[in-house]
Swiss-Prot record:
HAMAP family: Leu_Phe_trans
Subcellular location(s) of the protein: Cytoplasm
A matching Pfam family: Leu_Phe_trans
Keyword Ribonucleoprotein: no
Keywords: Acyltransferase, Cytoplasm, Transferase
Function of the molecule: Functions in the N-end rule pathway of protein degradation where it conjugates Leu, Phe and, less efficiently, Met from aminoacyl-tRNAs to the N-termini of proteins containing an N-terminal arginine or lysine.
Family note: Belongs to the L/F-transferase family.
Protein name, entry field: Leucyl/phenylalanyl-tRNA--protein transferase
Gene transcribed to yield this protein: aat
The species this protein was found in: Paraburkholderia phytofirmans (strain DSM 17436 / LMG 22146 / PsJN)
Length: 245
């Protein structure tokens, strides 16, 4: 049975999450609140919220866990060509934390195959914006000719980045933001991005599944490290692909 958490109740051990044979593998708990303090505690334990509008807040810790190691990020030839153009042309920019809430709202509006609606409601935007205001959540944004055309957002503690969602209004704009993030994380020797659940898109970029036990061990060690700086631009792409000579 999935426990209901009151405002002061702690999360149960992640090992108590529902198993693979259940109707909701990885579901750990439910609650009626999405307070910033609850979010911070969740991420530092390797737990994340995901639910549909009208449901209680559902908290998850799946096994296995999808992750992307920056060192294993795959750059297809077509994307490599695009990244070189981004580096070369002044019309392209990568901005960090320029308009965090707007990136979240754009992610909420992005169409998702097999999904109706979004869990990124106004309350969710406000909760994550609270983390952003204290430096624990960040947006990486792709801009072209002064207009934001793609991006992603996530949560960061110490040497761990927890990816949440991304969007693209032009081809590969979200991949440009991800590549810049990967470059920045490589510079600071970050070993893992949490991707939560397996998708073919993430796998094509180098994502792979690891056991929950391995994931939680890495999170516990990484979140206690000193925070990294969160100011960079498109030159972070140089860590991923050298510009054309």
């Amino acid at each position: 049975m999935v426990p209901w958490l009151g405002p002061d109740d702690p999360f149960p051990p992640v090992e108590r999450a529902l198993g693979a044979t259940s109707g909701a593998p990885g579901l750990l708990a439910a609650s009626g609140d999405l307070l910033p303090s609850r979010l911070i505690d969740a991420y530092r334990r390797g737990i994340f919220p995901w639910y549909s509008d009208g449901q209680p807040v559902l908290w998850w810790s799946p096994d296995p866990r999808m992750v992307l190691r920056p060192a294993e990020f795959k750059v297809a030839p077509s994307l490599r060509k695009t990244l070189r153009r981004v580096l070369r042309e002044d019309a392209w920019e990568i901005r960090v934390d320029h308009d965090f809430a707007s990136v979240m709202r754009a992610c909420a509006q992005a169409p998702r195959r097999g999904q109706r609606g979004t869990w990124i409601t106004a309350d969710v935007v406000e909760a994550y914006s609270s983390l952003h205001r204290v430096g624990d959540a960040h947006s990486i944004e792709t801009w072209f000719e002064g207009k934001r055309v793609g991006g992603l957002y996530g949560v960061s503690f110490g040497k761990m980045f927890f990816g949440e969602s991304m969007f693209a209004e032009v081809t590969d704009a979200s991949k440009m933001a991800l590549a810049a993030l990967v470059g920045h994380l490589r510079r600071h020797e970050i070993e893992m991005i949490d991707c939560q659940q397996n998708t073919s898109h993430l796998a094509s970029l180098g994502g792979r599944e690891i056991t929950r036990k391995s994931f939680i061990a890495h999170v516990r060690a990484s979140v206690e490290a000193p925070p990294i700086p969160w100011r960079f631009d498109k030159t972070a792409l140089l860590e991923v692909v050298a510009p054309a000579s």
